[in-house]
Regions:
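Short, aromatic-enriched amphipathic alpha-helices that serve as compact interaction elements
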Residues: 6-25, 33
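A solvent-exposed, acidic/Ser-Thr-rich amphipathic alpha-helical stretch
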Residues: 9, 27-80
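Short beta-strand segments enriched in hydrophobic/aromatic residues
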Residues: 34, 90-92, 124-126
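Hydrophobic residues on conserved beta-strands that form the core of alpha/beta folds
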Residues: 71, 85-87, 120
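Hydrophobic/aromatic beta-strand elements that line small-molecule binding cavities or substrate pockets
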Residues: 71-77, 90-92, 106-112
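A short, structured loop/turn motif at beta-sheet edges
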Residues: 76-84, 98, 111-119
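Short, cysteine-centered beta-strand-loop-beta hairpins and adjacent loop/turn segments enriched
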Residues: 92-102
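Short beta-strand edge/turn micro-motifs at domain boundaries
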Residues: 104-137
Length: 137
């Protein structure tokens, strides 16, 4: 049995691990999953952050009533040996007793093979409204 740290995750698994780390608000793991620096292209704005934890504001996200995020679908758009573009849709759900979808987004992640690991390098989103708590500072 392989140690999870030595396992080479596929790009889709990296995005799934990202959502899991996001749900845990684990900034250290998020910084390991994302490349440094990381780029956020939202609408016509581009922001570069030294690390992912600089781009996310969990207090802002929690204030929206957020409890967790779930991937609805994910698809390959392009893949080579060292670059992969994934497009996926996800929903943010509330922390109320009755589960409520707060937001639904479709984004793309550009992943690069850095060393022997896939890392997320960029988020690309068409919507100019962006996402609360992410790259909004």
């Amino acid at each position: 049995m392989k140690n999870e740290d030595t396992l080479v995750w596929t790009p889709k698994q990296v995005v799934e691990k990202f959502i899991s780390a996001f749900n845990s608000m684990d900034k250290n793991l998020l910084d390991q999953i994302w490349a440094s620096p990381c780029v956020f292209m939202i609408g016509n704005q581009t922001n570069v952050f030294e690390k992912y934890s600089d781009a996310v504001d969990f207090n802002n996200i929690l204030e929206s009533g957020w409890k967790y995020t779930k991937i609805n679908w994910i698809e390959d758009r392009y893949k080579s040996e060292d670059i992969c573009l994934l497009r996926f849709n996800f929903s943010r759900f509330s922390k109320e007793e009755e589960e409520e979808e707060l937001n639904n987004y479709t984004v793309s992640h550009l992943l690069r093979m850095l060393g022997d690991k896939w890392k997320i390098s960029a988020l690309i989103m068409d919507e100019t409204s962006g996402m609360s708590g992410v790259a909004s500072r």
